[in-house]
Amino acid sequence: NLLLCVLGQMGETFQTKMNKVLFYIDFLSFRERGLAISGLAYQALEFGPVPQRWDRGYSAFDDIEQQTKLVQEQECISLLSMGQADMSDFSPAEMAVIDEVCRKMRPMSSRAFSQMSHDEPAWKEHVGKPETIPFMDAFSLVNI
């Protein structure tokens, strides 16, 4: 339902950008409320923080359509919502976090957003390591 909510606010979104949006939603939520929203764990991969097993995650949702597109001679997968999010699943505090991240990230390109995530100590300290990024690193976020 979080994916549908984000796609409802942002429209068609590439996987690369969605990975970072989910990271920022969960880590900002943890910093502000002590709880993440999605229940996902994140790893610091070469191109930024991503949900663990993200490559399998998006295909598990019937309401999310994936389309392969060629962008600057590179294959990218875009995500499209085929349904509506049930907004009653989210508390007002959760919606405030989701809204803040989507509002800030919506106008950014996937590439710019990826570069921004590379400024985060949470990514820098864990890139290339097999462990997940600890949620305590939410307190070191610099871009939100």
Each model region followed by its residue ranges:
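Domain-edge interaction signal
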Residues: 1-144
